[in-house]
């Protein structure tokens, strides 16, 4: 996993400690424990948590792009959102589907 610098890039001057915790602890330590949980699975969990909390903003879009880069296909993403909709709420699912459609827009259609 490449070194995360988003915290420092976006908040470093305003909230240096938060930026440090974001980049060094959350992404530097937690996300890097691939022997415990793969990046793909961490992406899946993160998206479901964001969806469940109704957090549909640029940070969710980042995590959907991250999930795609970590190997979650368009079809899998659709199934993840559909499954989570019954637990996280239908309106949340609609919002996440629209964001996922943007991220996966240039993918080839699935072959039947």
Please state what every model-predicted region is.
Residues 2, 47, 61-62, 75, ...:
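Aromatic-enriched hydrophobic runs in primary sequence
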Residues 1-41, 52, 69, 93-112:
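Acidic, glycine/proline-rich low-complexity segments that act as flexible tails and inter-domain linkers
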Residues 60-83, 95-98, 102-103:
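A cross-kingdom feature marking solvent-exposed beta-strand/loop segments within repeated
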Residues 41-50, 60, 80-81:
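Short, structured motif recognition centered on aromatic/hydrophobic residues
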Residues 51, 83-90:
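A short structural micro-motif
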């Amino acid at each position: 996993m490449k070194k995360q610098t988003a915290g420092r890039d976006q908040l470093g001057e305003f909230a240096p400690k938060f930026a440090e915790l974001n980049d060094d602890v959350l992404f530097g330590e937690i996300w890097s424990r691939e022997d415990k949980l793969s990046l793909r699975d961490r992406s899946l969990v993160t998206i479901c948590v964001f969806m469940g909390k109704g957090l549909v903003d640029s940070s969710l879009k980042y995590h959907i792009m991250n999930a795609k880069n970590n190997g979650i296909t368009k079809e899998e993403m659709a199934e993840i959102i559909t499954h989570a909709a019954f637990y996280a709420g239908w309106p949340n699912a609609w919002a996440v589907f629209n964001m996922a459609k943007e991220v996966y827009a240039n993918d080839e259609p699935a072959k039947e």
